[in-house]
A protein has these predicted regions:
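Alpha-helix capping and helix-loop boundary segments enriched in small/acidic/polar residues
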Residues: 1, 8-11, 41-45, 236-239, ...
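C-terminal substrate-recognition/cap domain of FAD-linked oxidoreductases
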Residues: 25-28, 35, 39-43, 48-51, ...
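Activity-critical C-terminal alpha-helical subdomain
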Residues: 261-279
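FAD-binding core of FAD-dependent oxidoreductases
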Residues: 1-32
């Protein structure tokens, strides 16, 4: 949490410009009841109603936070690219469809938690089920826990238990690494689908699969992670990844979108996109 009054804390959050010597973390009391809601959508275009329904639930306070992952973000933590395709370039659509079918996942996965007294959570869950029932073809699963229950690893982060799982970086094998190009994007379904398809084109043109996630930090915007996963011991992949990162930043600027963080090698490029005080 920030200190009271004027503060410089924000200059050093998620940056390499400061060394943290003292930090305080506000802990939340364990709720009486906790439900994990997971929603799977099969088609790329399902992201439009998925986002629009979620936005309404965020605005009225039913859902406090949420994450959405595309097929690659879901799969990369449990498999590697070579298990599905050994050719060059991104996975062809036929391989993506086979991966989703055999792994039992959708094109999109939405996850969030509902917290509070058991009766309150039950009312929230009823509202969630009614709202998402309007989307054809989705599958919803719910897991619930009472205070003191043991939380399985797959639900631990939604229970406030940190995770340092780096498995997704193994997608291409070798020494897994990634460059992030995350944008702050409006929580509007049609607008995001257009952006997603454009960024997929850019990822694929550079020879990479599009690892995409959305984190609902406020009821009106997402943080859209765009992770370029590569083998840092492969010089050719490193060069392509760096070039793609620059391209993603420049393309986002044309859409009047900006990131909330960037690799230090791109900080001047990012800063040049803002015109306050003559850059």
């Amino acid at each position: 949490k920030y200190a009271y009054g004027p503060t410089l804390d924000g200059l050093f959050m998620q940056s390499n410009f400061g060394v943290v010597t003292k930090i305080g973390v506000w802990l939340m009391p364990e709720p009486e009841f906790f439900s994990v809601v997971e929603i799977m959508a099969r088609r790329e275009e399902d992201i439009v109603p998925l986002i629009d329904v979620l936005r309404a639930l965020r605005l009225d306070g039913t859902v406090s936070t949420a994450t959405i992952a595309n097929w690659m973000r879901i799969a990369a933590g449990n498999t590697t690219r070579s298990e599905w395709y050994d050719g060059k370039g991104p996975l062809p659509q036929s391989a993506v469809e086979r991966l989703m079918q055999e792994m039992g996942i959708g094109y999109w996965g939405l996850r969030f938690g509902l917290y509070g007294r058991e009766r309150v959570v039950a009312q929230k869950l009823a509202a969630v089920e009614e709202a998402f029932s309007r989307i054809d073809g989705i599958e919803m699963t719910v897991a619930s826990y009472k205070r003191g229950d043991k939380i399985p690893p797959e639900h631990s982060t939604l229970a406030g238990i940190p995770s340092v799982d780096l498995m997704p970086l193994n997608w291409l094998g070798g020494a897994g690494a990634h460059i992030e190009c995350p944008l702050v994007v409006p929580m509007q379904g049609a607008q995001f689908l257009d952006l997603y398809r454009r960024r997929t084109e850019l990822f694929n043109a550079a020879g990479f699969d599009h690892y995409c996630g959305l984190t609902s930090t406020t009821p009106r915007v997402f943080i859209n992670t765009g992770s370029i996963i590569f083998d840092r011991n492969d010089a050719e992949q490193c060069a392509r990844a760096r070039a793609l990162g620059k391209t993603l930043i420049e393309d986002a600027h044309k859409r009047r979108l900006a990131g909330y963080r960037a690799h230090i090698s791109e900080m001047d490029l990012v800063a040049s996109q803002f015109d306050f005080n003559d850059h």
